[in-house]
């Protein structure tokens, strides 16, 4: 075996670094917080498809940030920022008695009122299931341990023994139990997330804390059960592990369990039975499970708006999809505890403004600042030396703005927003440079202020937010994949200050932060009900608390759209502990099942019936009214904003004491249907709230959300139409080449995981060098050393010419793609396999092949579950899924190759929504194993080095490529290049080849081979020496045209038909598509593609056309099978890692070779 080609060290280092980055992007557990660890680049919204969202939100390990107008290339930190702790401001320690809690300053959910009635959780146990914890944080403290449920380690061990729990440790009086359910024996890498979540639920920092304000959770006196669960052996095992944690938490006395993690778009039906039983067990014992909705926004993630033709754009997944859980969305309140800065305005008034710092400025120091435009040009920074640079957001990455300012001598950076009412953004840390983000309003004030001086305050304060009260952009929308209403309720989740590892505190954002606040409120409300309703069972009190909490929530209103945020985004509204604690009434659906109304499919006219419950001893007089609204549409996309249709008039009702009464509200949206169907042809949501007040002029007392779908929701299309059918060549995740809409490149030489995402059929293109090697007896493809590689391409695509590495759809006259295969075992277009962009979750996917009579000749194995391709992001999921089980090798049920002809390749699947019927996608596939017949003789002119064949090739399918190949040694790698025919059909043979280092290698006639390939992938090849021998007994000549002194006796060389060159192959009768031999078949003219060109034919060529981009060593071939692998349909992160590792390493080798040959080609061009 030849010595392997050495790889340049720097290229290897780059590849390994890229692999590391991509693998690190695959989070084991998708905690519902997002980090600024992986900055991303914003792109302009002018791209026609997919459209970018216009709202900005700060940082995510899991998803990319939304695009905004004016921000062409800007790296930002996403708005759900996970692990970005801030260093505490430099402040002097305050006496313990003066330390206020964070809630004393700002309590948008009014928890303090509930605490006054129900206490702070003393004697109660709460559980947090999460990825990791700092078990010894200073905030894990009880004020009076004599009131604790577990007084000692011995008490805990007794409880464990009663329930057969043989694991778990006592940490201290506060953390009564800790256990790692992942069983991986590793210390949690992420201790931040679980610590932050636990602090919101039950933190209780000491007065001696160095922070200016003391952290106090919703239930600060409750004991904690900390349960670490992380993905180790796949999602199913993961779900079983947290199911065990749920059972243990219930058995150890937890009243509430918080689960701030999830897997987007997974359906409840996908969970193992053990997990479903654990949810039911907790419910039966009256234990509340609170989950976060997720940070995946909607279908398309945070970088794309969903298409208005596909209304099933919800992405709330598991465990949040479980009906028994209380699922929490995130919103930003109108006021926030924040760092502040002070300036004097032109009228000498002090102006205080909120700032979000990355590296804090020295407090109480007056800084000069200078305006630096958008921080792009050197001239922008002419006045910033020794000052703070004030820079507008936009055009370039934040890190570049900061770096440019530092290079110019600035001492810090202030970046202000380029849009009104935006969320604050965490800026990247650039060499510890002090930097902060401010609102557009404040930035413009600083720009125009004549006094260019600013001071940063030492102590944070509560100030109005620039965004106002608004649902967080990242917060995941419903419905669930099963078609159920989620989320249930909303809570503050934007820039929440809580505990992180090592006795520190930080602001993080995400639905992970929203859930533990609601968990604490639920725990306190149930505690209140123990006294208020002593005759109820724990499960009855749990049911009541959930209904009251949702009923008393305040529906959030979008001031910009003058409509309520959708119930599919906010659930019942913003949690209000004060209203819940005082509530004597609540509202449910007509069956008293839950405090939300799911109407499923509706017509233009329908009714909403709800039940109002009065638990007081007096009759209650109420006024009620319904809002009717739908989705706002912007062009072809949902704007992810509400659109009000109308509001019904207020009506009056009296509810008897200790009784209930039904209310029916008629809805008539018929006058809007024509316009709405024109915007949303596949149907639309009609939704809103039925709201109740004690007086029409007063604030809302309670409300209930309702959702109906005007159309057939269950039978919405589950799969995007094939890319072959796209009029403009684009799909949701695929942007067409504007100059060649039918261009569809295979996986070959670049990392196409983020690009080739559409519905199509895949196949493989195998070069003749590998086919020849296999025919000559090489059993292991890894032992083949060749500059060519096997590529995964898309069926029906072909390269137009050898020096164009791109593939293009070739179509029949009727516009259908020319998808043809030749299942003869040579690895070249031998199979087809389904790849789909799923718009919805589906089940029971199966492929089958039908002959022209409609008989099923082959059926694949079943793929039971398919998850919608809700994003195109390495950290979450890709924009399409390949299904290995659907690979058809052109054989029937008995394993025999089918007869030549045209077949229907059908993929069947069923959406998992209730009432859905089976759907299918069809492709026409030609099967043809007819070997091309080629000339048996040729002549060669030594004068102009032209090779002239005696006849044209005869093929059953149109000729794809007719070429002369030659192979030479470039160092230790056999290198193959090709010559296309001249306009007259002759070939001009070169005398020598050039290596990558510029050396020349003489070519002999025996180095050349005539290769013909048809569009089904049938290949025939013949040595040129054989063709010349077929014409005369001319001795072999070397590259100079001279006769060698002595020609060694050669063994008979085989051509592509396995015949010896001294024996003319017997021509077999050519068969037509039915397998019958026609009386006479005329020579097939090459079929032209949609551009009028014949694939593979290059006019006026004849010179060597190098397959430069396709060169690779055998090390790359070893990974070729990875492109066939089915991408995970269960969102399994561990499996994703393996697939991505293969793809990345393949990319490295292909990309390296492409780079080397690109450099070589550039050198040749300069000559």
Curated annotation (Swiss-Prot):
Chain positions with Pentaglycyl murein peptidoglycan amidated threonine modification: 1130
Q: Write out the catalytic residues in the record.
A: 130 (charge relay system), 193 (charge relay system), 512 (charge relay system)
Q: Report if keyword DNA repair is assigned.
A: no
Q: Which residues form the signal peptide?
A: 1-31
Propeptide, residue positions: 1131-1167
* Reaction it catalyzes: The primary cleavage site is at 67-His-|-Lys-68 in human C5a with a minor secondary cleavage site at 58-Ala-|-Ser-59
Q: Can you cite a GO biological process for this protein? A: symbiont-mediated suppression of host innate immune response
Q: Where is the composition biased (Basic and acidic residues)?
A: 1044-1071, 1078-1090
Where is the region Disordered? 34-73, 1029-1133
Q: Where in the cell is it found?
A: Secreted, Cell wall
Compositionally biased spans, kind Polar residues: 34-52, 1092-1106, 1120-1130
Q: Name one GO molecular function term.
A: toxin activity
Q: What is its EC number?
A: 3.4.21.110
Q: By its UniProt entry, which Pfam families does this protein fall under? A: CHU_C, fn3_5, PA, Peptidase_S8, ScpA_C
Give the protein's biological function.
Answer: This virulence factor of S.pyogenes specifically cleaves the human serum chemotaxin C5a at '68-Lys-|-Asp-69' bond near its C-terminus, destroying its ability to serve as a chemoattractant.
Its family remark reads:
Belongs to the peptidase S8 family.
Name recorded for this polypeptide: C5a peptidase
Q: Which organism is it from?
A: Streptococcus pyogenes
Encoding gene (name): scpA
């Amino acid at each position: 075996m030849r010595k392997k080609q050495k790889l340049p060290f720097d290229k290897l280092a780059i590849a390994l670094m890229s692999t590391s980055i991509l693998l690190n992007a695959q989070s084991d557990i998708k905690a519902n917080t997002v980090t600024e660890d992986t900055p991303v680049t914003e792109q302009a919204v002018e791209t026609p498809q997919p459209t970018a969202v216009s709202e900005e939100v700060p940082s995510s390990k899991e998803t990319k940030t939304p695009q905004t107008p004016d921000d062409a290339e800007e790296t930002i930190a996403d708005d759900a920022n996970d692990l970005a702790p801030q260093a505490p401001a430099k402040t002097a320690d305050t006496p313990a008695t003066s330390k206020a809690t964070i809630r004393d300053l700002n309590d948008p959910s009014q928890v303090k009122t509930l605490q006054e009635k129900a206490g702070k959780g003393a004697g109660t146990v709460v559980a947090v299931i999460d990825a990791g914890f700092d078990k010894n944080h200073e905030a894990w403290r009880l004020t009076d341990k004599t009131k604790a449920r577990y007084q000692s380690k011995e008490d805990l061990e007794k409880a464990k023994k009663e329930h057969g729990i043989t694991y778990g440790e006592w940490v201290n009086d506060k953390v009564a139990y800790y256990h790692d359910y992942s069983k991986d024996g590793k210390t949690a890498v992420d201790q931040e997330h679980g610590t932050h979540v636990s602090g919101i639920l039950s933190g209780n920092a000491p007065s001696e804390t160095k922070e200016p304000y003391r952290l106090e959770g919703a239930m600060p006196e409750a004991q904690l059960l900390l349960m670490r669960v992380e993905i180790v052996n796949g999602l199913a095992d993961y779900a079983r592990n947290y199911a065990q944690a749920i059972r243990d938490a219930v058995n150890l006395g937890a009243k509430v369990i918080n689960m701030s993690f999830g897997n987007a778009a997974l359906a409840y039906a996908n969970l193992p039975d053990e997990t479903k039983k654990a949810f039911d067990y907790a419910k039966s014992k009256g234990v509340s499970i609170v989950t976060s909705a997720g940070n995946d926004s909607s279908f398309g993630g945070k970088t794309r708006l969903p298409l208005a033709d596909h209304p099933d754009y919800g992405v709330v997944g598991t465990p949040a999809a479980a009906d028994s859980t209380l699922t929490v969305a995130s919103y930003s309140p109108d006021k926030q505890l924040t760092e502040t800065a002070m300036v004097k305005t032109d009228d000498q008034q002090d102006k205080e403004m909120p700032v979000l710092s990355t590296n804090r400025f020295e407090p109480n120091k007056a800084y000069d600042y200078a305006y630096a435009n958008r921080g792009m040009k050197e001239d922008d920074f002419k006045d910033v030396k020794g000052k703070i640079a004030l820079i507008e957001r936009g055009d370039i990455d934040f890190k570049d703005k900061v770096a440019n300012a530092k290079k110019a001598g600035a001492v810090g950076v202030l970046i202000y927003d380029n849009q009104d009412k935006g969320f604050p953004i965490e800026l990247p840390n650039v060499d510890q440079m002090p930097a902060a983000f401010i609102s557009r309003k404040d930035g413009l004030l600083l720009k125009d202020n004549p006094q260019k001086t600013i001071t940063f305050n030492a102590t944070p304060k509560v100030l109005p937010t620039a965004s106002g009260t608004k649902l967080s952009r990242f917060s995941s929308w419903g419905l669930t994949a099963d078609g159920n209403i989620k989320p249930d309720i909303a809570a503050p989740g934007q820039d929440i200050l809580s505990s992180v590892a090592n006795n520190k505190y930080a602001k993080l954002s995400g639905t992970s932060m929203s859930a533990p606040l609601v968990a604490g409120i639920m725990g306190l409300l149930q505690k209140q009900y123990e006294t208020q309703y002593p005759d109820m069972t724990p499960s009855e009190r749990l049911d009541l608390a959930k209904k009251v909490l949702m009923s008393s929530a305040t529906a959030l209103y979008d001031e910009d759209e003058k409509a309520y945020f959708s119930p599919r985004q906010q659930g019942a509204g913003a949690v209000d502990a004060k209203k819940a604690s005082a509530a004597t009434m609540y509202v449910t659906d007509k069956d008293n099942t839950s405090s939300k109304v799911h109407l499923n499919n509706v017509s233009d006219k329908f009714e909403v019936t709800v039940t109002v419950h009065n638990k007081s001893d007096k009759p209650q007089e109420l006024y009620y009214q319904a809002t009717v609204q739908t989705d706002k549409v912007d062009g072809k996309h949902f704007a992810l904003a509400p659109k009000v249709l109308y509001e019904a008039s207020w009506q009056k009702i009296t509810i008897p004491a200790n009784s209930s009464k039904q209310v029916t509200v008629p809805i008539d949206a018929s006058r809007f249907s024509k316009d709405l169907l024109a915007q949303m042809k596949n149907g639309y949501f009609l939704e809103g709230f039925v709201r109740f007040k004690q007086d029409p002029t007063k604030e809302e007392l309670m409300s209930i959300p309702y959702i109906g779908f005007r159309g057939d929701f269950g039978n919405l299309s589950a799969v995007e139409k094939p890319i072959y059918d796209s009029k403009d060549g684009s799909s949701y995740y695929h942007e067409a080449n504007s100059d060649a809409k039918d261009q569809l490149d295979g996986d070959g030489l670049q990392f196409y995981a983020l690009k080739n995402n559409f519905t199509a059929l895949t196949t493989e293109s195998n070069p003749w060098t590998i086919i020849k090697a296999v025919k000559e007896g090489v059993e292991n493809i890894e032992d083949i050393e060749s500059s060519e590689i096997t590529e995964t391409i898309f069926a029906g695509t072909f390269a137009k010419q050898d020096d164009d590495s791109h593939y293009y759809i070739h179509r029949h006259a009727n516009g259908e793609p020319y998808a043809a295969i030749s299942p003869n075992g040579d690895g070249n277009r031998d199979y087809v396999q389904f790849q789909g962009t799923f718009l919805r979750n589906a089940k029971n996917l199966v492929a089958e092949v039908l002959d022209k009579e409609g008989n099923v000749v082959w059926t694949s194995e079943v793929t039971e579950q398919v998850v919608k391709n809700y994003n195109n992001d390495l950290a979450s999921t890709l924009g399409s899924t390949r299904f290995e089980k659907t690979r058809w090798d052109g054989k029937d049920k008995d394993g025999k190759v089918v007869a030549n002809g045209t077949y229907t390749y059908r993929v069947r699947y069923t959406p998992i929504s209730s009432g859905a019927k089976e759907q299918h996608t069809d492709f026409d596939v030609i099967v043809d194993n007819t070997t091309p017949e080629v000339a048996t003789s040729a002549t060669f002119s030594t004068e102009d080095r032209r090779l002239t064949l005696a006849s044209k090739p005869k093929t059953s399918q149109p000729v794809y490529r007719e070429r002369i190949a030659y192979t030479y040694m470039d160092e230790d790698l056999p290198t193959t290049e090709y010559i296309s025919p001249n306009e007259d059909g002759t070939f001009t043979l070169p005398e020598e080849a050039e290596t990558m280092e510029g050396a020349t290698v003489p070519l002999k006639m025996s180095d050349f081979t005539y290769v013909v390939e048809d569009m089904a992938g049938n290949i025939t090849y013949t040595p040129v020496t054989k063709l010349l021998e077929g014409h005369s007994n001319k001795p072999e000549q070397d590259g100079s045209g001279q006769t060698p002194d002595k020609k060694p006796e050669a063994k008979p060389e085989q051509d592509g038909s396995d015949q010896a060159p001294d024996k003319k192959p017997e021509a077999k009768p050519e068969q037509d598509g039915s397998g019958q031999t026609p009386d006479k078949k005329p020579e097939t003219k090459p079929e032209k593609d949609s551009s009028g060109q014949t694939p593979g034919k290059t006019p006026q060529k004849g010179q060597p056309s190098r397959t430069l981009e396709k060169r690779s060593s055998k090390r790359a071939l070893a990974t070729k099978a990875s492109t066939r692998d089915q991408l995970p349909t269960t969102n399994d992160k561990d499996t994703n890692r393996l697939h991505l590792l293969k793809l990345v390493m393949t990319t490295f080798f292909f990309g390296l070779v492409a780079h080397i040959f690109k450099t070589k080609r550039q050198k040749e061009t300069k000559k």
